[in-house]
Amino acid sequence: YKEGYADHVLRFVKGLMAYVPMSADLYIAQHSPVMGRVGNTTKIINANDLFSLVRGHKVNFISGHNHVNDNFQYETNISEHNVAAICGSWWDTQHCKDGTPRGFKVFTKKDGKLSWYFKAEGHDKDFQVEIFKPGQMPMHPNSVVANVWDWDPQWKVEWYEDGRYMGAMDRVTDKSPLYTKEINAAYKGKTISEYKLPATAQHYFAATPSQYAK
């Protein structure tokens, strides 16, 4: 199947925007994210045409589909929240395939400002990170790695060693050992469907501790 905006959809949006004041913020909910499937480097069909119709407004796309969690900033006033799934990996696991716990996102607008947080099922709203010790992460075995699933470019991820500030952690690509364990247990040695295989994600942050760190 193809993902994008059909010509008749663009015509509808163009007509609709004639009635929307320029001061209005826009929230566009759709199933597929603007970037399409995981790993895509180009936008879905006619995405740039849609952008041209809504440009000038503050625009937030809210999407799903991929069972991963990402925040994208396409332009100064055009961003997207691609939200992980409440069902994890189609009810087989407690985590989505990028390592995000199954859950949902809560949006609040107050005094003209939009805020949000990811609510992991079974946890309170402050549960926003999982930490992995050296030896646990497949692509960074010598590092402490933080999975900060709702990270966006406005966030800073920093670390301390034995109470001493060490600076910013390095943003890295990795896969979740928790999801890998869960999906392997669910399939019990059978071939895992391709769309459920562990996905590399860019919301991991790594730091290498010193030899004698406590």
What are these regions (language model features)?
Residues 1-82, 142:
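His/acidic metal-ligating clusters that form di-metal
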Residues 35, 123-124, 166:
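Structural signature of outer-membrane beta-barrel domains
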Residues 68-69, 101-105, 191-194:
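Short small/polar-residue motifs
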Residues 78-162, 204-214:
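Binuclear metal-dependent phosphoesterase catalytic core
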Residues 155-182:
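Extended low-complexity, serine/threonine- and proline-enriched intrinsically disordered segments
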Residues 176-210:
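Aromatic sugar-binding surface patches on proteins
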